Amino acid sequence: MHLARELGVNLADQRLAQALDEADPLAHLRQEFSIPQMKDIKQADLKLVEAESDCIYLCGNSLGLMPKRTRTIVNEELDTWATGGVTGHFPDGPGKRPWVSIDETVTDKCARVVGALPEEVAIMNTLTVNLHLLMVSLAHTMARQVPFYRPTSDRFKILVEAKAFPSDHFAVLSQLRMHGHDESALIEVKPREGEHNIREEDLLAILEEQGDSIATVLVGGVHYYTGQFFDLQRLCAAAHNKGCTFGVDLAHAVGNVPLQLHDWDIDFACWCTYKYLNSGPGGIAGAFIHKKHEGTSRPYLQGWWGVQLNERFRMDHDASFMPGVRGLQLSNPGVLQTVALLGSLEIYEQTDMASLRAKSLKLTAYLEQLMQALVNEEGHAPRFEIITPTDPERRGCQLSILFKVDIDAAFEALEKRGVVCDVRRPDVMRIAPVPLYNTFTDVYRFVTTLRDALNASASS
């Protein structure tokens, strides 16, 4: 980094991390979040760490930290419930956010994060529920009205990336079985022998060879295990060229990497909000259907929350449904879950995805360089390797570390030193410096702590 040269320090000098933090235009956003302290981490050994110092939290790819304002916002809704009961649903009730339209407090804000038109987004359910709804929803595709997955005798396969998140795998298999197909109709694109990431040209080749028999392509925007960020616009165009519907699981992409779902012509997408969008454990999810499907779309499965807002409480069986994805809403969303998401999205409104991405690229590059220096340390055979793509444009903030030594011993040693990250079996540790609240000093502390942990686990 050029700043290291300007300061006359090497990459491993803590002064570089401090200087990078001082120059960070988004540094103030950290104060918006509750950062657990060492004394709060049950696994931390307080003989090894300072009890009152912040823990090293690098697990926003699993669960984002709590925005401080979320407690206030949630308590406001509890107060509305306590003082108004059912009247909290209506504009003349005691609350400032009528529950009858509570999802509208977050829909537009979330649409900006994913690069969609407001009417293309619905906040509802959980990710896998939304995936099922989207796969059976009707849409006008290739000049015929079909669901995003309704197989025919000629076109019935589903193309996914190998080692997709298990819930996606289960959902897709169950869709196949529901339509009378078995696992042979599931095409999984795998990395080449000896590689960890999928070559997009291999996926494109499968599309070219088998596209006429593929009904739906479903990929994870950012792969949960390796951290690979797919070129969604390129893959979507190739899928459409072969007459396939293209959908995306954005669980590890939303709030992490820049997205332009509308401009990229994505057919459908779904995401959770408890990772980079910091809505809390089990938080409400999001769904997207491109506006091009709106004119000829009709919800395949329906519920009362998909009815036009001005008709919703008329309880009329002849009610008209909202167009597009909002017509897929089945039941009223949990108010507390919805406003928990609002707390985080208000912080996103203090910046933009371009600024967050710029910081993220620097944070993860700094982590990568420090980790690579640790790999190359004299006196040690390489104890791990980074399996996330080295191209910054093909990854988000996460680096996935494949351990060549005992990962359990290393992880336990990290926990004792107040590091919060996660392990995905059999031997990968995921490290995610989140630009909203992580610092360059967090990254520096992690790598120096990892060195200590590796040495401690090796000697134990």
Swiss-Prot record:
- For this entry, the protein name equals Kynureninase
Q: What does this protein do?
A: Catalyzes the cleavage of L-kynurenine (L-Kyn) and L-3-hydroxykynurenine (L-3OHKyn) into anthranilic acid (AA) and 3-hydroxyanthranilic acid (3-OHAA), respectively.
Q: Please name one Pfam family that this protein belongs to.
A: KYNU_C
**The gene coding this protein:** kynu
Signal peptide positions (record): none
* UniProt record similarity statement: Belongs to the kynureninase family.
Q: Tell whether Cytoplasm is among the UniProt keywords.
A: yes
Q: Which InterPro entries match?
A: Kynureninase, PyrdxlP-dep_Trfase, PyrdxlP-dep_Trfase_major, PyrdxlP-dep_Trfase_small
What is the predominant subcellular site recorded for this chain? cytoplasm
Which residues are listed for pyridoxal 5'-phosphate binding in this entry? L127, T128, F165, P166, S167, D168, D249, H252, Y274, W304, N332
User: What Enzyme Commission number(s) apply to this enzyme?
Assistant: 3.7.1.3
Q: Quaternary structure per UniProt?
A: Homodimer.
Please provide, in alphabetical order, the Gene Ontology terms of the cellular component aspect for this entry: cytoplasm
What's the domain of life for this entry? Eukaryota
